[in-house]
Amino acid sequence: MKPLHLKLNNFGPFLKEEIDFSKIDNNELFLISGKTGSGKTMIFDAMTYALFGKASTEQREENDLRSHFADGKQPMSVTFEFQLNHRIYKVHRQGPYIKEGNTTKTNAKFDVFEMVDGKYEIRESKVISGTQFIIELLGVNADQFRQLFILPQGEFKRFLISNSREKQGILRTLFDSEKFEAIREILKEELKKEKAQIENRYQQIDLLWQEIESFDDDKIKGLLELATQQIDKLIENIPLLQARSKEILAFVNESKETAIKEYEIIEKKTLENNILKDNINQLNKNKIDFVQLKEQQPEIDEIEAKLKLLQDITNLLNYIENREKIETKIANSKKDISKTNNKILNLDCDKRNIDKEKKMLEENGDLIESKTSFIDKTRVLFNDINKYQQSYLNIECLITEGEQLGDELNNLIKGLEKVEDSIGNNESDYEKIIELNNAITNINNEINIIKENEKAKAELDKLLGSKQELENQINEETTIMKNLEIKLDHYDKSKLDLNDKESFISEIKSAVKIGDQCPICGNEIQDLGHHIDFDSIAKRQNEIKEIEANIHAIKSNIAVHNSEIKFVNEKISNINIKTQSDFSLEVLNKRLLENENALNNQRDLNKFIEQMKEEKDNLTLQIHNKQLRLNKNESELKLCRDLITEFETLSKYNNITNFEVDYKKYVQDVNQHQELSKEIEDKLMQLSQRKLIEQNNLNHYENQLETYNNDLELNEQSIEMEMSRLNLTDDNDINEIIAWRGEQEELEQKRDTYKKRYHEFEMEIARLESLTKDKELLDSDKLKDEYEQKKEKMNTLIDEYSAVHYQCQNNINKTQSIVSHINYLNQELKDQQEIFQLAEIVSGKNNKNLTLENFVLIYYLDQIIAQANLRLATMSDNRYQLIRREAVSHGLSGLEIDVFDLHSNKSRHISSLSGGETFQSSLALALGLSEIVQQQSGGISLESIFIDEGFGTLDQETLETALDTLLNLKSTGRMVGIISHVSELKNRIPLVLEVKSDQYQSSTRFKRN
C-alpha cells in the first residue's frame, strides 16, 4: 500500500489541508518535521482513520480527532487515495457529529472507490461493509496496520519491553492465534462431554444389571452380585445368566404343556356327552312333530286338485285377456285416424292464406328490382362517400393555395438570382489558410526554442556554479578530515580501556594485599601503589572522542554534499539545448505578425463566401420545396375534380346528402322485401313438410287398424277351441274357476311348506338316530366339576409361563443392551484416547508446559527475532542480538525477550540497554515483525512504512546506521517516512514535509534542503 494523496477537513489541527505524496520521487526517504503539537502524528492518524475509523494509537478516541476550531455545521472528514498492487483506490470517511442547532447526531459515512479507465467507480457505501472491504483488500486490520505500515510514537518500543502476557495480546492480534485457544477450549469441552458420556454409560450398565430378574434362583442371585464396574467379568457372566434363565423357562413350560393336554381331554369328553344329550332330546321331539304333520295329508290332496284345474285353464284365460287388449287398440287407432284427417284439413287452409300473401308481394317486384339496380351501381360511391364529400369541401381551398404558392415561388427565384450575382467568380481558399497556419506554427516553434535555450543556459550556469561550490566544500572538508585522522593516529591509545575501571581497581586493591594471588591474572601481587594516571587517560579519551565526532560530522557533511552533487548532476543531464534558427527574435516576431494578418483576412473572405453559398443552398432548397408543394397542390386539385365528376356521372346526383338519404332508403326497402319473401317461402316449406308427415301418420294408423281386426278374429277362434277342450259351456263356469286364482299363491305355498317339512323330518330323524345309536350318556355334573378343576390348573400354569417368559426375554434384552453398552464403551475409550492425549498436550500438559497458542506464538516470535537480528547486527556493529528467554515455560511465559551481548558473551535483561540501544533494538524488532507478518499474510503489499519519533536518543554514529537501515528499505521499493525533531536529520534527508502551526490551524508543504 502506497499513499498518493491525503485530504483533511476539520481533522485535528488541520481545518482544510491536502498532502500530495506523489511529489515523493522513486520512493524517496522523507522527513516529517514541525514543532511539538503542530500535528505531525495527526497525519498518521488521518491515514489510519480513513481506512479503519481509528487513530494510529489506541489512546486516541474518534471524538478526540475533530478540530476544536471546526465550524459547528461542518463535518470532520478524511479523503485518502492510495495505490495497491498497481491499482488505485480512494476512501472518504466522514465522522459522526452533532450539527450546530441539532440535538441528534449525524451518522458517520464511508465510501470506497476504485479507479477504472481513469474514473473512480464506487465499490462500497456503508460504514461496516466498507471497513470490512478495506480489511479484506489490505489483508490487515487496524492493529496489524499499526505494526506494519505505521509505527506510532512509542508503540513499536512497547513490543520490545512488554512481558509475555502483553506480547501474547499483540501477537494474537497480528497472527490470529486465538483460533488455537479456541481449539483448546473446544477440546476441553469435548473431553468434558466424553467423560460425562462414559460416566453415563457406566450408570446405564449398572441400572440395567440391577433390573435383571433373579426368579428367586440362588445361582442367578450369585451371578448378579458382581460389581458392574468389572465390565470384563460382566461379559463372562451374561451367557451363564441367560442359560440358567432358559432352564427355568423350560421347566415351567413343561408343566404348562402337561396341564393343557389334561384340560383338552376332559374338555373333549364333556363336549361329546353334551352333544349326545342334545341329540337324544332332539330325536324325541322330531318324532312327535312328524306324527302331527301327517294328520294334514287329506287337506293337502284337495289343494293339489284345485291347483291342477287352475293350471289347465291358464291358456283360455290368456286368450280372453288378449281379446280385451286388441279391442282397446282398435278403438285407439280409429281415434288417431280422425285426429290426423282434421290436421290435414287445417294445413290446407293455412297454405291458401300464405299463397295470397305471396301473390301480393310479387306485385311490387319491378319497383324493388329498379332499387336493387341503383344500389349495385352506386355501392362503390356510398362505401367511399367521405372521399367524395371531402373533394367537394377541399376544391376551393386548393385553388386558393395554388395561386399563393405560385407567387411565393416567383419571389424565391428572384432572390436566388440576386445571391448568385453577389458570389460571382469568388471561391473559398482553405489551402492558403493551412499554409499560413503551418508558417505561424513553425515561427512560434523557433521563438519557443530560442526562449527555452536561453532559460536552459541560465539554469546550466547556475547548476555548474553550485556543483563547483560543493566540490570545493568537499575538498576543504576532506583536507580537514585527513588532518584530523593524522592527529588521531598520533595519540597514545594505550590503557584507554582502563578509563572506566578506576572504581573496579580500587575495590580489588581494598580486597587484596601484597603477596596474594591476583584474581585477574593469577600472579603474585608485589605492589599496591598507583601505576595508572586515570586523569591523563580520561583527558586523552575525551580529545579522541572529540576528534572522532568531528571526523564523523565531516563524513556526514561530505555524504550530504555528494548526495547534493549527484542530484545536481541528474539535473544537468536532464538539461537539453536544442538547435535554433539563425533569425533574431525581432525578425521572427515581424514575420509572425504578417502571417497572422494574412490569415485573418483570408478567414474573413472564406467566411463571407461560405455565408453566401449557404444562403444560396437555403434558397435553392426553399424553391425545390415550394415547387414540390405546388405540384402536390395541382395533383390534389385534379384528383378532387375527377372524383366529383365520377360521383355525379354514376349517381346522377350533385348533392352528397340527398344521395345518402335516398341510398339508405332504397337499401332498407330492398332488405324488407327480401326478408318478407324469405319468410313466406319458409312458411310454405314448413306447411308442406308438416302435411307430408301427417299423411304418413294417416297411412300408418289405417294399416294398424286392419292388423288389429285380423288379430281379433284369430283370438276368438282360439277361445272357442279351449272351452270345448275343458268342457266349459258358458262364462259362469269360467268365472268360478277364475275366482280360485286369487287363492292360488296361498294354496301353492301351503302345499310346498307341507312337502318341505315332511322331507326335513325324515332326514333329521334319520340323522339323529345314526348319531345316538349304540352310545351311553354319562353323569353331566360329575364331568363339569372335573372340567373346572383342569381348566383352573391350566390357566394358572399359562400365566406363570407368560410371566417367566416375559421376564426371561426382558433379561435377554437387558443383557444385550449391557453388552452393547460395554462394546460401545470399550470402542469409545479406544477412540477417545487420542483426543484425551491431544487435549492434555494442547492444554499445556507436555514436556514444555506450553499451550498450543503459546507454542505457535513462540514460533512466530523466534521468526521475528531472527529477522530483526539481521538489522540489529548492522546497527549495533555486530555487538547485540535479541534472544527469547529460555526459561521453563508455563501458561503465558516464554515470550520475554533478552539481549545477548557478544562482547561479554552473556545475555542480559532488555532494560539494561541505553536509550539509543533500545531504539535500535525496537526499530529492528518492529521491521522484523513487519516482514514476518507480511510473509504469513501473503496478500499484504508493503510499499510504505512510517516511523514516529525515537531518533533523539541516538548518537551520531548510531543515527547514521539507523538511517542506512531505512535507506535499505527504500532500495527495496518501499516509501519511508520519518517524524523527528533531530536537526541532524534535516541535513541528512533532502526531502522534508514541513508542518507549520499558527496556534489556530496547521498547514503542510514539501521542500528540499
UniProtKB/Swiss-Prot annotation:
List the Pfam families hit by this protein, alphabetically: AAA_23 (PF13476), SbcC_Walker_B (PF13558)
Does the keyword section mention GTP-binding? Answer: no
List UniProt keywords, sorted A-Z.
ATP-binding, Coiled coil, DNA recombination, DNA replication, Endonuclease, Exonuclease, Hydrolase, Nuclease, Nucleotide-binding
One annotated GO molecular function is: ATP binding
Keyword match DNA damage: no
Residues annotated to bind ATP = 34-41
Gene3D superfamilies the UniProt entry points to: P-loop containing nucleotide triphosphate hydrolases
Specify the signal sequence span.
none
Q: Which residues form a coiled coil?
A: 176-364, 401-501, 535-805
Gene Ontology terms: biological process:
DNA recombination; DNA replication; double-strand break repair
| The organism's place on the tree of life at top rank | Bacteria
User: What family does the Swiss-Prot or TrEMBL record give for this protein?
Assistant: Belongs to the SMC family. SbcC subfamily.
UniProt xrefs under PANTHER family = ABC TRANSPORTER ABCH.3
Q: Describe its partners and assembly state.
A: Heterodimer of SbcC and SbcD.
Q: What does this protein do?
A: SbcCD cleaves DNA hairpin structures. These structures can inhibit DNA replication and are intermediates in certain DNA recombination reactions. The complex acts as a 3'->5' double strand exonuclease that can open hairpins. It also has a 5' single-strand endonuclease activity.
**Which protein are we looking at?**
Nuclease SbcCD subunit C
